[in-house]
UniProtKB/Swiss-Prot annotation:
InterPro entries the UniProt entry points to: ClpS, ClpS_core, Ribosomal_bL12_C/ClpS-like
Gene name linked to the record: clpS
Pfam families, A to Z: ClpS
NCBIfam families: PRK00033.1-3 (NF000670), PRK00033.1-5 (NF000672)
Organism per entry: Sodalis glossinidius (strain morsitans)
Complex and partners: Binds to the N-terminal domain of the chaperone ClpA.
A Gene Ontology BP annotation from the UniProt entry: proteolysis
The protein's name: ATP-dependent Clp protease adapter protein ClpS
Superkingdom of origin: Bacteria
Purpose of the protein: Involved in the modulation of the specificity of the ClpAP-mediated ATP-dependent protein degradation.
Amino acid sequence: MGKTSDRLDEQHLAEEQVKDAVRPPSMYKVILINDDYTPMEFVIDVLQKFFSYDVERATQLMLRVHYQGKAVCGIYTAEVAETKAVHVNRYARENEHPLLCTLEKA
């Protein structure tokens, strides 16, 4: 009886470890924040260049940033979201714009 109980305990422990190991990664929203200085055309360029939106969808998102103060550009794993935000912020600074890209847990 002890061996069966031990095997069941080991099997249960292994199942719990597998459940923990295959937990989906945390996801993060990549958000553009409005400012009074960055040209609308530059925001559209950013949305096309870094998020692969066509000009129509990029324009819609740019208008959301402009009128609502911010817009979610996409939802990604932490590493991808952070990389996109860093690239957008660097590109904005290189072009002397104060555009800000942030992350928020989804």
